[in-house]
Amino acid sequence: MVSRVLYRPFDTEDFDAIALILRQLWHNNSDNDEYNRLEAACDLAYCLSSSTFSQVAVIDGEARGIALARAGQNSGVTINEHWMDTERALLSQMRELEPDACAEYLSFVRATIRTNNRLLEKSPLPHDNEVTLLAVDRDVHGLGVGTVLLDAAVSHLSSLGATRAHLYTDSNCSWKFYELHGFKRTATHRANREERRHDMPRESFLYELDLTA
């Protein structure tokens, strides 16, 4: 039974718990559990390096969900560099442990970036004001944690004067959740055969939220 839910900014002590959530959700393709752990941690470090806002859900003293967002390019230089360095160090460990799996992961990341850029080109949206990550432990789904985290990220962007927010998701994720919270799909990309070879989802989506409504 949940006795307490606390929402606060990300703390470095949350890193391992949040990375475990990402690992369980998206980073479990390798038979090597240690590699999966490193890959999830690398993904989280990347997201932290490109974000200027964080909110973590702490339930009974344990981090169980996170939202990250990016508003402009004018803050977080020091912490961004820290997480970029962390990402590089983790990539080095991944290459040493499982070079083939690491190469495939990097191919996937590059394909994802290309896809996201194509999606954004189809929309008049600015490149800033993005919800960069939303992840919630499966064990606490249905408790409203994701809703509170998403609302916190969107409210932060709005408080800085943003009139629109956007995010990327895909057919492997719970995209209907965003529609229930007012986001509208503005662009779709269907993966070609080469992209599918790199484990890209069948469809990738750009979602937009009007913050003036």
Tell me what each language-model feature is.
Residues 73-129, 193-200:
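Conserved acyl-donor/pantetheine-binding loop and adjacent beta-alpha core of acyl/acetyltransferases
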Residues 136, 142-155, 180:
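Conserved acetyl-CoA-binding loop-helix of GNAT-fold acetyltransferases
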Residues 33-59, 64, 68, 89-92, ...:
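Active-site rim helix/loop that mediates acceptor-substrate recognition in acyltransferases
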Residues 128-129, 157-170:
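Conserved GNAT acetyl-CoA-binding A-motif
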Residues 147, 171-188:
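Conserved active-site alpha-helix within GNAT-family acetyltransferase domains
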Residues 132-141, 166-176, 191-195:
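Conserved beta-strand-loop-alpha-helix junction that forms the acyl-donor binding cleft
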Residues 20-36, 45-46, 71-74:
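Helix-loop element at the rim of GNAT/NAT acetyltransferase active sites that forms part
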Residues 4-20, 71-72:
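A short beta-loop-alpha structural element at the N-terminal edge
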